Amino acid sequence: MPKKLLIKTWGCQMNEYDSSKMADLLNAANGFELTEVPEEADVLLLNTCSIREKAQEKVFHQLGRWKRLKEKKPDLVIGVGGCVATQEGDAIRKRAPYVDVIFGPQTLHRLPQMIKDSQSNHGPVMDISFPEVEKFDNLPEPRADGVTAFVSIMEGCSKYCTYCVVPYTRGEEVSRPIDDVLYEVAQLAEQGVREVNLLGQNVNAFRGPTHDGEMASFAELLRLVAAIDGIDRIRYTTSHPIEFTDDIIEVYTDTPELVNYLHLPVQSGSDRILTMMKRPHTVLEYKSKIRKLRKVRPDITMSSDFIVAFPGESDQDFQDTMKLIRDIDFDISYSFVFSPRPGTPAADYPCDISEKVKKERLYELQQQINTQAMRHARQMLNTEQRILVEGPSRKNIMELRGRTENNRIVNFEGSAELIGQFVDVNITDVFTNSLRGELVRTEAEMDLRVAMTPLEVMEKARKEDELGVGVYTP
């Protein structure tokens, strides 16, 4: 009987990607199968996030629930990974000595051996180091789970914004070799993936080594991924405005696979607050980049992160943020009240903003975004939209569900063979969280671009000969 594995994931899309790789690793090494029932599991893994307030206590509450399972089942292995593990590894060992494995985001590839060591040593094993790109060199081949997939192209961040823990929990920026990224995308395309989401904490800072010792830019990577047959839609997250350069904007002019949607976090609309955050750009510079982008993609939809009530934020600073939201006309926001993260400079900044004002500002910001989002949705009424059909509708299993370029769900009537294909639909109704459409044409009636088959890409990607020397076929 196969062993069972449960992975509980908190946090960003990078954590979701990491969790999928943990599952693949343990399946390849030990035959583990995933379960959603904790009582069935032989291994329980918690992949944590430390971005929000009280992240550590949330971890210990979850571990307390799992402790009761371990008391009934002593051979149960409990592991904690992710950013909280990196920050609080020693504290976890002290407060939760029943935890068997503690690992960081950069050492998840060592998980099978760490579990084995914990069982043979009958004691906890911890590895929260930063071993550069070794993580990617030791991951199993990707397994597609549907028609969309995440592909991590880099790790870490070197910007050190004053509020952010990422450089301390995931390390400095490290990019994967470009051939490795293309090989993974080609493998996914060969398995039926049609849309890839390129991931990184600062994804547009990608500088990937090539087979001949040069460095490939993020713009070059986007064009190469777009050239892989079957990959007809590309997203990426998360971007930094300072790295959103003209060569990336140029890709939007000639790469239809790049979606008409961009998440480019600005955090605040006040230059004074941006300086305190150590964000190396002004509001005017941010708006200038968006203006350039909209010259080549006039209909592009924008989203951003916002931190409300950063220490020292005045009423005028907040109103500057509200003005920027209206000026850019953001469609989506991920907005939070400032949460001091231990070990970051901003955690020591004095803050005299009352809880009442914090909540009022967050509410005002989110209401403005919601108003703009509904207007954007209504503007799609009676327009034709191309969607990627992801599966049955969650509201009605007799219908299908797809996603537009600007990340909106569309439910429509259609047959199951359309799953995994692109279709054009006419938007007939607008709801708060979704749209309704009618089928106009199927993929067979489209002229999607073909450049290079996945197998051709895989043949050209970097390999090693019997002596371990990297070779490349141009």
Swiss-Prot record:
Gene3D superfamilies: Methylthiotransferase, N-terminal domain, tm_1862 like domain. It is an enzyme of class 2 (transferase). Binds 2 [4Fe-4S] clusters. One cluster is coordinated with 3 cysteines and an exchangeable S-adenosyl-L-methionine. The keyword ATP-binding does not apply. [4Fe-4S] cluster 2 binds at residues 157, 161, 164. Residues 378-441 form the TRAM domain. Its cofactor is [4Fe-4S] cluster. It is found in: Cytoplasm. Signal peptide: none annotated. Belongs to the methylthiotransferase family. MiaB subfamily. [4Fe-4S] cluster 1 binds at residues 12, 49, 83. Keywords: 4Fe-4S, Cytoplasm, Iron, Iron-sulfur, Metal-binding, S-adenosyl-L-methionine, Transferase, tRNA processing. Monomer. Its EC number is 2.8.4.3. GO terms for cellular component: cytosol. This is tRNA-2-methylthio-N(6)-dimethylallyladenosine synthase. PANTHER family: CDK5 REGULATORY SUBUNIT-ASSOCIATED PROTEIN 1, MITOCHONDRIAL TRNA METHYLTHIOTRANSFERASE CDK5RAP1. NCBIfam families: miaB-methiolase (TIGR01574), MiaB/RimO family radical SAM methylthiotransferase (TIGR00089). GO terms for molecular function: 4 iron, 4 sulfur cluster binding; metal ion binding; N6-isopentenyladenosine methylthiotransferase activity. It comes from the Bacteria. Catalyzes the methylthiolation of N6-(dimethylallyl)adenosine (i(6)A), leading to the formation of 2-methylthio-N6-(dimethylallyl)adenosine (ms(2)i(6)A) at position 37 in tRNAs that read codons beginning with uridine. It catalyses: N(6)-dimethylallyladenosine(37) in tRNA + (sulfur carrier)-SH + AH2 + 2 S-adenosyl-L-methionine = 2-methylsulfanyl-N(6)-dimethylallyladenosine(37) in tRNA + (sulfur carrier)-H + 5'-deoxyadenosine + L-methionine + A + S-adenosyl-L-homocysteine + 2 H(+). Residues 3-120 form the MTTase N-terminal domain. Its main location: cytoplasm. Residues 143-375 form the Radical SAM core domain.
